[in-house]
Amino acid sequence: MSNTTVEQFAAELKRPVEDLLKQLKEAGVSKTGGGDSLTLDDKQLLNAYLTKKNGSNSSTISIRRTKTEVSTVDGVKVETRKRGRTVNIPSAEELAAQVKAAQTQAAPVRPEQTAEDAAKARAEAAARAEARAKAEAEAAKLKAAKAGNKAKPAAQKPTEAKAETAPVAAETKPAEESKAEKAQADKMPSKKPAEPKEKAAKPKHERNGKGKDAKKPAKPAAPAVPQPVVSAEEQAQRDEEARRAAALRAHQEALLKEKQERQARREAMKQQAEQQAKAAQEAKTGRQRPAKPAEKPQAAAPAVENKPVNPAKAKKEDRRNRDDEGQGRNAKGKGGKGGRDRNNARNGDDERVRGGKKGKKLKLEPNQHAFQAPTEPVVHEVLVPETITVADLAHKMAVKGVEVVKALMKMGMMVTINQSIDQDTALIVVEELGHIGKPAAADDPEAFLDEGAEAVEAEALPRPPVVTVMGHVDHGKTSLLDYIRRTKVVQGEAGGITQHIGAYHVETPRGVITFLDTPGHEAFTAMRARGAKATDIVILVVAADDGVMPQTIEAIAHAKAAGVPMVVAVNKIDKEAANPERIRQELTAHEVVPDEWGGDVQFIDVSAKKGLNIDALLEAVLLEAEVLELTAPVDAPAKGIIVEARLDKGRGAVATLLVQSGTLKKGDMLLAGTAFGKIRAMVDENGKSITEAGPSIPVEILGLSDVPNAGEDAMVLADEKKAREIALFRQGKYRDVRLAKQQAAKLENMFNNMGETQAQSLSVIIKADVQGSYEALAGSLKKLSTDEVKVNVLHSGVGGITESDVNLAIASGAFIIGFNVRADASSRKLAENENVEIRYYNIIYDAIDDVKAAMSGMLSPEEKEQVTGTVEIRQVISVSKVGNIAGCMVTDGVVKRDSHVRLIRNNVVIHTGELASLKRYKDDVKEVRMGFECGLMLKGYNEIMEGDQLECFDIVEVARSL
């Protein structure tokens, strides 16, 4: 940028030097003589002053000049109206000093781009100062403007002239104006590159048409008639802008004060928190450390900083100054690209200053903390649901997933980050990693059931007792019930043994009694446990001629576990070998003491075959029921337990339900485990259709969506939607738990089987009439497994044999067991075509024996030695290139050509091998019998002597059995 003197500029304009000095003085530029230097800023101030003074109607304005001048002044608009700075307003003398300082700082001349940046920085700094002066002056003249006074000459308001947008003022003569403009353009070649950026800084309200003076070309003004600077309408608009600026300043001052108070409060809270933390730490560790003095808040930066301008960094410094001044961006709630505020990036008040280039650390203000690592590990309380993935468990403990995987691998489980584990395993992992694990109550709809149970209250009335008959197999349980019911159930049972739970109710002169008949066979443990769970009183049947047997002891354990009183029926006392006293002694050893011996258990000697003392047994049962005072609500939704369940081909899922409370009616919505449905039919134990059943009455129900598990609790719900929701939730929950346990079992088997030879597997598919039967059969077959042959139950279910069962058997090479069920025609045809074996049974013994035989056939045969003869060596003949030949006498049995032999010397086995050749005289023979001589050679062995004995034997394979 080149400077000119006042005289040179006056010569270019063809104006007297005195007039030019006068106009400069009126414009706020203090020049005393013609030799004083004029800068570009001085010329701009003079230009703005003449524009205001003479009007804006010139038609010879250069486009380039218009862009340059408007852009520079537009920056003032942005800083004044949009940013609304909260600053200290300097006086007119201070403004002049600042302008002079800016001119002095810009004295060193650099290349064009550097000069452009420096000029722009100075112009914007001066414009900000002028904007403050303008705001103060306009506020002072607000009353005069409202009274309708005309604006004073621009010479009395130099700062006001600089704050308005206007084109270059025209001189009185167009010729002089043209020459001046041409000379100005020749003198300032470095201004042109700055035009695009300055144009980009043009405020939005100017582009929308608010700066109307900038868009119209100026017309020549008459020198004799002075023109008003602005119209009354424009003056009113400016007054309104001034009022808004004053209100904005007041608001910003309030915000600044509030921010300072907030910082002070935060500092106090920070100091207090630090002191408390240090005190707690010192109390814990026993170390006393001096308290850290509180940091003082930084003093507020001055509103306008007149720093020396470095032209190379003028743009960056200017942007930083604008962001640091006041709260221009913060007041609007946005700043920078994307509306993001750098100063309030985190909490709106913490100001961060980045220093220097890459690699410099972030400098924090006093109200910010650097992150401090925790001094001790944090212990979390982890709520663990029934199943949880490894990733979720790690998230709950706030640790990395790899730590959980590592802990599980130490426990012998190979898992992935997305794999589910069961609740027990997860609790162990939580404890292992130092946290507190608690089983979480599932957020399931089953809570509705408890709420509904509490809400329903009905009068409890006496109910019949539920009596379960238990005992060892063939001790006469069903025969006893037959006599009580006057029926012949035993004759209809396969093999004379009970394989289902039978539920009956019997009317006696003293009331109704419900009986549950449980199987006595060892395979039906689960059935006996379910019977004890649903019962009030247990009748323990013991045969007087047989004594206490394993299932008798098991029945005692079930009764004690359920907390149920017992009545002992000593059966078969009509037999000659009956010894009731021995039964009492044996049961006393198992803590079942007769009442006549000082105990609390009634012993009744009965005969189911002849009906002896049956009435006394029923009296004892009813006496126990009176002591228990059994009651249940009648007028309430029914609740009960599933005793047995099966799949009937014609009727669908059929379940035997023992009602425990309430009244079950036809059409009720029943929920039983994972099955639900509306009761379509109810049948009693005699096959008669009934419409309702009260407490302690067993019924057979139809209409469930699936076959429920035996032992499940069942209850009536009023809402089908709620029943469906709970059933589906249970299905998903049980599936997740089952999969998690299966995965754990697979991994355990994988580790256990590492390095072992692969055992043979016998695959079997079991279909039975009721759930209890296939449970018992599957459990018994699995017990037959050995290290060499294992029973693999691929599928077990209730109902007839279907095509899907046959197809599964084809794919897996299994055979099918039908227990009290049959295959339909299509299934039989498919099985015949594919050679799939289907075996039907109605006695559990037979099924177990056949499977055991099949497993025995899969066992590898056992090799045994069978001695065939004995040979005595009487002469040894050595033949070159052949070896030693033994001349022998067969003393016992027979010697065969392919026999194995043992060489025995002095009753010690020297060698075991085979014969290389066997001859009698010169002929090869297959065998030589006792009493004949022979010659023989041993294969690969020549160390034989006279007097040695040879023991001949064969190796035979013997089939093994389980």
From Swiss-Prot:
Pfam families: EF-G_D2, GTP_EFTU, IF-2, IF2_N. GTP binds at residues 471-478, 517-521, 571-574. The keyword Nucleotide-binding applies. It is found in: Cytoplasm. Keywords: Cytoplasm, GTP-binding, Initiation factor, Nucleotide-binding, Protein biosynthesis. Residues 571-574 are annotated as: G4. This is Translation initiation factor IF-2. Residues 517-520 are annotated as: G3. HAMAP family: IF_2_B. Residues 462-631 form the tr-type G domain. Its main location: cytoplasm. GO terms for molecular function: GTP binding; GTPase activity; translation initiation factor activity. Residues 145-155, 219-234, 270-283 have a biased composition (Low complexity).
